[in-house]
Amino acid sequence: MKVRLFEIFTSVEGEGILYGTKTLFVRLAGCPFTCFYCDTKESLPLNSGTEYTIDEANKLIDSNLHDQTYKVNFTGGDPLIQHQAVAQLAKHIQNKKIPTYLESSCFDIDRFNHVLPFIDIVKIEFKTKDSDFVDSEHYAKLIGHTMKCLESSVISKKTTYIKIVVSSKTQPNEFKKLVDDIFNIISKENIDGFIIQPTYGISEPSLDLLLNLYDIVFPYYIDVKVVPQLHKFIGAP
């Protein structure tokens, strides 16, 4: 089996509940979406990056591990594009007793369930309609898969948190519908974090909008946080 890796690097976690922790990032090539706010557009094509065998990729990852590595983060693109390879790479890392972390929009429940046994921490990104990448019919299908993946992660008792990227284009009524739907299938006790992530440098949301969106989530989940991307402020990759 082969895998296409765009890059491997050590940095600090710039997003979410593990914000600021030292992390080895394994960025895989390929993504099915073209969100307007994407900050890694060069990794979207599946033919980007470099092709390796699984053994070669495992050796490359091993050569970048340090005693202080807190976790290994599989990111993209979207790692589920190469789900079979991710499962093998993550299993290799788990055997070293290092936590594995998946960042994904969870666009396919079958691919997700194939990877899930080898993942410890799951960041599920729910896309909003204003992401400008699909029509309404395809958006509904995507959200259906993402919801199923959320349920699967919770049932499997993985550390699970939700991220929603918001911009000045985000409509509070659409955001509220998405949040209502999320908490119709899970309870607040089922997740480990809920992050509202504002875009940076493009269509940035106002503070008033961010507070409005925060107030929508708060009745469901009082530990909701608005968290910008740390790495963009400290010059990290």
Spans of model-derived segments:
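Residue-level signal for well-ordered alpha-helical segments
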Residues: 1-8, 12-15, 34, 38, ...
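N-terminal [4Fe-4S]-dependent radical SAM core
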Residues: 1-27, 32-51, 63-65, 236-237
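Conserved Radical SAM active-site core
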Residues: 3, 37-120
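Generic structural signal for well-ordered alpha-helical scaffold segments
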Residues: 13, 58-62, 151, 183
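Short, flexible micro-motifs
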Residues: 17-19, 23, 78-80, 128
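Short aromatic/hydrophobic contact patches that present stacked aromatics
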Residues: 23-25, 71-73, 161-163
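Conserved AdoMet/S-adenosylmethionine-binding subsite of the radical SAM
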Residues: 81-224, 229-231, 235-237
